[in-house]
Curated annotation (Swiss-Prot):
UniProt domain Saposin A-type: residue ranges: 18-58, 518-554
Signal peptide: 1-16
InterPro entries, per the entry: SAP_A, SapB_1, SapB_2, Saposin, Saposin-like, Saposin_chordata, SaposinB_dom, Sphingo_Act-Surfact_Prot
Gene Ontology molecular-function annotations: G protein-coupled receptor binding; ganglioside GM1 binding; ganglioside GM2 binding; ganglioside GM3 binding; ganglioside GP1c binding; ganglioside GT1b binding; identical protein binding; lipid antigen binding
Location of this chain's protein in the cell: Lysosome
Sugar-bearing residue positions: 80, 214, 331, 456
Source domain of life: Eukaryota
Residue intervals of the Saposin B-type domain: 59-142, 193-274, 310-391, 435-516
Name of the protein this chain belongs to: Prosaposin
Record SMART domains: SAPA, SapB
Keywords noted in UniProt: Disulfide bond, Glycoprotein, Lysosome, Repeat, Secreted, Signal
Disulfide bridge partners, by residue number: 63-138, 66-132, 94-106, 197-270, 200-264, 229-240, 314-387, 317-381, 345-356, 439-512, 442-506, 470-481
Removed propeptide positions: 17-59, 143-193, 274-309, 390-434, 517-554
């Protein structure tokens, strides 16, 4: 009923203009269809509905309010409210208006034109803007744009340019700036060219100096670029920020390892005797197929960069494992050891630190249990892919290595399975993937979530990202992604709360195939020589006395 009261108020605003001269009916659609009162007087309601009021409308507050009220009025009619009841209520609403003249006008409008308006509402429930145009509360979009252009021409002022409209065409011209397709018709003056080159080199030098001397400069620059991303609109803004997060660090590193002259030559501000080789530009129609509509996310770090850091990771891992072995010998508590591992993980670079923390949270107790049974620390670093495996140790520690590898999220090649004793390691088999393609789409979706969600995200945040994540994948994957999320959402949500490693998550829920894997069993005698030979009692219990005498105790 509140909606009807608001509708009555809008009717007063729209229809209290003076009665028009009958000659106005010959003035054409623009005049006849300016409001419902004129259209009724000229008997042109149907004509106005078809030719004028049904056209797109400009966005405005009165128009939006009117559309809401008309929609609510239509809902009341659907609830079987009679026209007499609505008319009586509107007349009572008019009586509440304090201004006596407005109250009388309101009642006159309701009595005279409400049946026409209600008929329009019944017939055009899907387009409330048509009714609001008849009430002169919504303006035609075509008319609005024409008025704007005319006003700009008459003002004789230079309009302010929206930066967001300038950025996009500028970005599209960057390839032509880097690799011009045609030589300039006239060579620039040497002096001017030298000035531009010197200015470019000075700018790059100043930026490099600021990066070295001011620790907050890079972050400030990144924040400034993200502010510019906000001006690109809701859809492009998130993609822009995602690119900045992925590639800003790599871009700064590249700039710091290049000479200013080299950078300025690349962007075309400085000349070089040996010209920079030009790349063949891909036509825009072809390039956009690879970039849009999905802007596929890629890892910001190349594989060879990670491999170059493996030596450092290996040394750090060996140092940490040796220290933990010493603490175990000194009877340190498990809580103290876990804290020590967590601190060690935090000292690693970002990619390795995140992986280290995930492995620690999920499998920390199992790793410590293996260390307590005198497994070589260097070998342990090998099986978690931070060091190259030592071939001399593989033969003697094959079973515990297989157990550790199966507990880690990363899946190396499965080890050879030894002959199973009566009590052996538990066997687990991941069911084959369903629908033949969920493995690939699962990994792409988890990669998207990994890049766009903060660490320790809540279930609600992960669920919201899942619901819209499929729309950011390439077209061939979107339908399949929707089916995948619909089928696996509950299980996927439970795992993503704990870990977001694509290979681990997709294997865990069973959409990516995997070989039989050995899991760390409850029977300790399957842990291998590191456990069998710790003392004679354990060796006897595991039937390994002869083995320990030949290979360990000699």
């Amino acid at each position: 009923m509140y909606a009807l009261a608001l509708l009555a108020s809008l009717l007063v605003t729209a229809l209290t203009s003076p009665v028009q001269d009958p000659k106005i009916c010959s003035g054409g659609s623009a005049v006849v269809c300016r409001d419902v009162k004129t259209a009724v007087d000229c008997r042109a309601v149907k004509h106005c509905q078809q030719m004028v009021w049904s056209k797109p409308t400009a966005k405005s507050l009165p128009c939006d309010i009117c559309k809401t009220v008309v929609t609510e009025a239509g809902n009341l009619l659907k609830d079987n409210a009679t026209e007499e009841e609505i008319l009586h209520y509107l007349e009572k609403t008019c009586a509440w208006i304090h201004d006596s003249s407005l109250s009388a006008s309101c009642k006159e409008v309701v009595d005279s034109y409400l049946p026409v308006i209600l008929d329009m509402i019944k017939g055009e429930m899907s387009n409330p803007g048509e009714v609001c145009s008849a009430l002169n509360l919504c303006q035609s979009l075509q008319e609005y744009l024409a008025e704007q252009n005319q006003r700009q021409l008459e003002s004789n002022k230079i309009p302010e340019v929206d930066l967001a409209r300038v950025v996009a065409p500028f970005m599209s011209n960057i390839p032509l700036l880097l690799y011009p397709q045609d030589r300039p018709r006239s060579q620039p003056q040497p002096k001017a060219n030298e000035d531009v080159c010197q200015d470019c080199m000075k700018l790059v030098t100043d930026i490099q100096t600021a990066v070295r001397t001011n620790s907050s400069f890079v972050q400030g620059l990144v924040d400034h670029v993200k502010e510019d991303c906000d001006r690109l609109g809701p859809g492009v803004s998130d993609i822009c920020k995602n690119y900045v997060d992925q590639y800003s660090e790599v871009a700064v590193q590249m700039m710091m390892h290049m000479q200013p002259k080299e950078i300025c030559v690349m962007v075309g501000f400085c000349d070089e005797v040996k010209r920079v080789p030009m790349r063949t530009l891909v036509p825009a129609t072809e390039a956009i197929k690879n970039i849009l509509p999905a802007l596929e996310l890629t890892d910001p770090y190349e594989q060879d960069v990670i491999q170059a850091q493996n030596v450092i990771f290996c040394q750090v891992c060996q140092l940490v494992m040796r220290k933990l072995s010493e603490l175990i010998i000194n009877n340190a508590t498990e809580e103290l050891l876990i804290k020590g591992l967590s601190k060690a993980c935090s000292l690693l670079p970002a990619p390795a630190s995140t992986k280290c923390q995930e492995v620690l949270v999920t499998f920390g107790p199992s790793l410590l249990d293996v260390l307590m049974h005198e497994v070589n620390p260097n070998f342990l670093c090998g099986v978690i892919s931070l060091c190259s495996a030592n071939p001399n140790l593989v033969g003697t520690l094959e079973q515990p290595a297989a157990a550790i590898v199966s507990a880690l999220p990363k899946e190396p090649a499965p080890p050879k399975q030894p002959e199973e004793p009566k009590q052996s390691a538990l066997r687990a088999h991941v069911p084959p993937q369903k629908n033949g393609g969920f493995c690939e789409v699962c990994k792409k979706l988890v990669i998207y979530l990994e890049h766009n969600l903060e660490k320790n995200s809540t279930k609600e945040e992960i669920l919201a990202a899942l619901e819209k994540g499929c729309s950011f994948l390439p077209d061939p994957y979107q339908k399949q992604c929707d089916e995948f999320v619909a089928e696996y959402e509950p299980l996927l949500l439970e795992i993503l709360v704990e870990v977001m490693d694509p290979s681990f998550v997709c294997s865990k829920i069973g959409v990516c195939p995997s070989a039989y894997k050995l899991l760390l069993g409850t029977e300790k005698c399957v842990w291998g020589p590191g456990y069998w030979c710790q003392n004679s009692e354990t060796a006897a219990r595991c039937n390994a006395v002869d083995h320990c005498k030949r290979h360990v105790w000699n």
